C-alpha cells in the first residue's frame, strides 16, 4: 500500500517541516513547561463564537437528524469513515516506528475494504484484528518532540494548534492517500467532492455522538471556550502519549452507549 520510497519521501518532508515549525512555533523553549499559549485568544474567541453560531444553525440540526437514522446506517457510515482514516493512520504508524500497529491497520483496511464492502462492515474485528487508535501527522510531530505552538481555533474546523495545523497541511501535500486519490487525481469514479463529503460526514458523525456531552459542557462551563480548549489539548496529549485516559467525548466505537 505504501512502498518504502513513499514512506521515506514523507519522512523527509516531515523532517523539513519540523525545521519550519521551529521557526513558526511561538512557544516556551523550556522543556518542562507544559502550558500551551493562547497567543491569538481574541481572534480565537471570535472564531469560536462564529463556529458555535454555525453549529447551532447547521451542524447540530444535521447531527440531530442523523441520530434518528436506523442504527445499521449509523454503524455502517461510522465504520466506512473510520476505515478511510487508516490511510492517514498507517503511514503515521510507520513514521512513529509502530510497525505492529501499521500491520494490524493495513490488514484491517484490506479486509474491511473488500469483505467488509468498502468498510461498511468490520469483519476484521471478528478475525481478532481489534480497532487501533487513530494517528495523524500532528501526533507524529508530537512523538518527535515538536512543541504544540500556539493554540488555534480554525473556522468551521474548530480547535487546533500550530503543530496540528501543519500536520493537516502535510496530509494535503501527499500524506493522505484518500486526498491524493480524490482531490489530486479527480477521476470518473472518485472525485474531489468525495473527499470533502467524507470529511463532512466525519464531522457530523462525531457531532452526533457527542450531542449530550457538548450540551452538558456548554451548560455547566463558566467559560465554554476555555473548557473546550482544555479538553482538546488534554485529548491530544493523551493520544500522543498513547494513554488510556478517557475524555468526555465519544469515538467511533461508542454508538452502543447512545442507544436508548
Which residues does each predicted region cover?
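Low-complexity, intrinsically disordered or signal/transmembrane-proximal segments
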Residues: 2-5, 22
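Bacterial N-terminal signal peptides that target proteins for export
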Residues: 4-16
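Bacterial N-terminal signal peptides
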Residues: 15-25
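A structured, mid-to-C-terminal "fold-capping" secondary-structure block
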Residues: 32-35, 144-260
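N-terminal targeting signals for Sec/Tat export/insertion, comprising classic cleavable signal peptides
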Residues: 37-64
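Membrane interface segments of multi-pass transport proteins and intramembrane proteases
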Residues: 57-75, 127, 138
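Beta-rich strand-turn-strand
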Residues: 78-80
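Mid-length scaffold segments of soluble, non-membrane domains
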Residues: 83, 92-162
